[in-house]
């Protein structure tokens, strides 16, 4: 931190100092203002779920953990980073937002007041291994893949705790680097118009498989894709039977690139060649919680409130079934000009099918209509 020029920024209720740099990637301590929406969504969620002891495992400037302490009911907030520059900056940023005296010993500084804030200088895996079954909520927001932290996070969270997991390595999850996806996520990705949803379902699926090793199941609270990152919040369920029930929600996708038609197969192993997965085929949201999140977001002072509300409202209204039809991609395949998305949705609903927009694609439609009915509808109207 010696001779480092700092500037102050505000996000939500938090004020923090960040290193002045030409780009965020040149900074010795990483802060990405584009991820403010990501942090808004978790702030909204924690206001509904009320976890008491929370960990921001990869804190950098400390912005996420500081917002947890300022904007949620959490009583004990841990901020951690392996970088010494980050550790020193986190201490300054905590004191910029809270009164009191930091007590420091061996790479750990603690501020006790209305809330307890612990600033930790260590490898995230070592901290989580040390704090076995301790945290009610753990947020993993790494630069790239979260996979090297997932095992220890599952052991560090309470057996009915909550995990928030971000993946920013879109190229593997979207099928541009399929071997990297197979190595990291143990799944075959699907390239093309469905890749954002398939990538999200691969991420949830691998969390489910890792959890099952520890006799844990999962319920998905919310999983979504936004701005080149994949995000999943899951609640852990204790017991081998819960793990077994969770694994039953895994399966595979068969996709015909010539037509845009897809088929789903539930089961731990595929029965046919050219299967994509395994992926999570269960729900991507808890409808009651997401509905509460919309109302909660309206009452909070968020950094990107308009964007947060738009995203949450769309997910709230979205049909929660696997995959969708992309009207532009199918139009190109059929060599026809398709109508506006809303017109197609109305035509499907008039025939008695469920149909909604999807946040995964501005030209996508989720519907209960079979592929043949969907094609007939877009040709007819």
UniProtKB/Swiss-Prot annotation:
S-adenosyl-L-methionine binds at residues 39, 64, 81, 123-124. Its EC number is 2.1.1.216. The keyword Nucleus does not apply. The keyword RNA-binding applies. It catalyses: guanosine(26) in tRNA + 2 S-adenosyl-L-methionine = N(2)-dimethylguanosine(26) in tRNA + 2 S-adenosyl-L-homocysteine + 2 H(+). PROSITE patterns: SAM_MT_TRM1. Disulfide bonds: none annotated. GO terms for biological process: tRNA N2-guanine methylation. Pfam families: TRM (PF02005). One of its GO terms (molecular function) is tRNA binding. Keywords: Methyltransferase, RNA-binding, S-adenosyl-L-methionine, Transferase, tRNA processing, tRNA-binding. Residues 7-378 form the Trm1 methyltransferase domain. CDD domains: AdoMet_MTases (cd02440). It is an enzyme of class 2 (transferase). PANTHER family: N 2 ,N 2 -DIMETHYLGUANOSINE TRNA METHYLTRANSFERASE, TRNA (GUANINE(26)-N(2))-DIMETHYLTRANSFERASE. HAMAP family: tRNA_dimethyltr_TRM1. Dimethylates a single guanine residue at position 26 of a number of tRNAs using S-adenosyl-L-methionine as donor of the methyl groups. Belongs to the class I-like SAM-binding methyltransferase superfamily. Trm1 family. This is tRNA (guanine(26)-N(2))-dimethyltransferase. It comes from Pyrococcus horikoshii (strain ATCC 700860 / DSM 12428 / JCM 9974 / NBRC 100139 / OT-3).
